[in-house]
């Protein structure tokens, strides 16, 4: 970021926030290429254009000019290939422009984050919180004291124009916003945000993934901003007498005028949502709101969120996108795990002088299991088994060497074991490993034109032993003198703080 500040002359850019001229700066596209994007088209050899392996600002300028034209000329050369200067190639155009736009549109947010005093106080030792697994110890500590949850699928905007309007509060450069709006109109389908089922994060095209990821994250940030503000303010409210409580009968009518009377009745409205035991967590397009409150309070939260999305942000919110469930009899489908809080009965023997008593108590226990059915569906989509869970061979890998095939299957198996190490019941995970083991054997047998049984007999019992090694054996290497402890540890949940992305097979489900 320091290198970027030197390029942009931060003091001058803060005064006016002019972003449009940055589109014509060569280092912007160099930064876009160097910051982990896919290989840029601007660096691809363009023999058709007569250019070397480098980007050209002439291309960018002509693409921007063409975006404002009503008609596009298509000029073909002798080999019937469209001329990329004047031809209408939407994929090329959108990728070339979006690479620069994606970097530029992030600048106001990145610079404010770097210059904010809060960012300087961040402890580097807290980097482990980036791990996906770090959220589960938090859930284990908090959910035991709560009763109800709201399973929320964050809605999507009806039109991307709403995102552009929201960006106006952060970006004051009118020409850049106009170009951004025109770019979205011309080169992207507005219905791309209307996703199938619940997958909101998978609609991004591979070419423009960074650009749309930014728009999506900004969309989620704005939708959560007022909710987080209300939540923080409710902590500072003192206990109020019942006369400040709005009439429940007219609650749903009054909530419609929430933003009209926001300033006048702010503390009164906050009293409705005052709940010191509420917890909120989110990953991608799914969020969970848990509370110790009554079902009536959860209904109020649901109605409030729906009205907030529809009336303030103009998001298309369907009633079935928010479900109210009780923690004691409901699984939370989150981050590839099925989590629940189950009451576990136990008997405690109490001795008082000469008499003894047996007391029955119920202890809440946080439980996480592997969702076997979605995982089998993911394996079926990846062609490792059918949808009934019967292992099949992987013909696409049959041309590889034996060691390469074993390494591929082993990598998948180790990643699954690593990601689902926090499961309290390993039976489902063993079944997934069995499917992968037999699929690997079938693939090798197919390659050598043999049966699976004869192939396994020829290799012996040590077949695939290395890449199917259990965590119990790994722990025995780390703790050789306390093997009993390592075996017990393997039966318990293990959370790793080096997992920063969700498992690919979990994303397929």
UniProtKB/Swiss-Prot annotation:
Pfam families: Intron_maturas2, MatK_N. One of its GO terms (molecular function) is RNA binding. Keywords: Chloroplast, mRNA processing, Plastid, RNA-binding, tRNA processing. GO terms for cellular component: chloroplast. One of its GO terms (biological process) is mRNA processing. The keyword Plastid applies. The keyword Plastid applies. It is found in: Plastid, Chloroplast. It comes from the Eukaryota. Its main location: plastid. Belongs to the intron maturase 2 family. MatK subfamily. This is Maturase K. It comes from Clematis florida (Asian virgin's bower). The gene is matK.
